[in-house]
UniProtKB/Swiss-Prot annotation:
Keyword Secreted: no
Entry EC number(s): 6.3.5.-
GO molecular function term, any single one: asparaginyl-tRNA synthase (glutamine-hydrolyzing) activity
UniProtKB keywords: ATP-binding, Ligase, Nucleotide-binding, Protein biosynthesis
Catalytic activity: L-glutamyl-tRNA(Gln) + L-glutamine + ATP + H2O = L-glutaminyl-tRNA(Gln) + L-glutamate + ADP + phosphate + H(+); L-aspartyl-tRNA(Asn) + L-glutamine + ATP + H2O = L-asparaginyl-tRNA(Asn) + L-glutamate + ADP + phosphate + 2 H(+)
This protein's name: Aspartyl/glutamyl-tRNA(Asn/Gln) amidotransferase subunit C
Gene name linked to the record: gatC
Annotated organism of origin: Burkholderia thailandensis (strain ATCC 700388 / DSM 13276 / CCUG 48851 / CIP 106301 / E264)
InterPro entries, per the entry: Asp/Glu-ADT_sf_sub_c, GatC
NCBIfam families named in the record: gatC
Record text on subunit structure and interactions: Heterotrimer of A, B and C subunits.
SUPFAM superfamilies per UniProt: Glu-tRNAGln amidotransferase C subunit
Alphabetical GO biological process terms: glutaminyl-tRNAGln biosynthesis via transamidation; regulation of translational fidelity; translation
Domain of life: Bacteria
Length: 99
């Protein structure tokens, strides 16, 4: 898949982006290089290969990189709702906007 300069300008217009011609040409080159890489990866025969969530774990013993899920700060609902103009049962009351 290869994009044209017209495609890039159309996409920029749809995204409401102002793009100079030089920027559009540079973006076109970068996108086409990216799509070329994707085509190369799609050409690789992966028949019989199971998908891996973390492929590096297959070749290295890696410790879990994610931190423990622990509470680091406590939220005091009453303090947060004190400046609100209207609160009821721990919920913010707002004006009805859709009838």
């Amino acid at each position: 898949m290869a994009l044209t300069l017209t495609d890039v300008k159309r996409i920029a217009h749809l995204a409401r982006l102002e793009m100079a011609d030089a920027d559009a040409e540079r973006t076109l080159t970068q996108l086409n290089e990216f799509f070329g890489l994707v085509e190369q990866m799609q050409a690789v025969d992966t028949t019989g290969i199971a998908p891996l969530a973390h492929p590096i774990e297959q070749i290295l013993e890696v410790a879990q990189r994610l931190r423990d899920d622990v509470v680091t700060e406590h939220v005091n609902r009453d303090d947060n709702q004190r400046p609100a103009p209207a609160v009821q049962d721990g919920l913010y009351l707002v004006p009805k906007v859709i009838e």
